[in-house]
Amino acid sequence: MNKKVLDRINAIADIYTTSNREQKAMEELIELLNGLAHRDKLNTLEEFADVIITMIQVLRKYDLRIDSLDRWIEYKLDRTEKRLKSND
């Protein structure tokens, strides 16, 4: 995701309260779950976008940086890969 898009997401986040963004994120997660349950690929893609946007906004409201998320993603991937190798 490029900086221009992140800046737009963050600018919108700054308008709303933390509680509002938390609530919106939960709503979007429910919509994503519904899209997955119905195997509606186009709707699922749209809902993925909504979830990603609102999650980035929640990170901002919590004063967490996206690079902190990157570190957690790396950790989780490493852990999963180690687990998979140990099952071979």
Residue ranges and their predicted role:
Residues 1-88:
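Flexible "arm" and connector segments at domain edges
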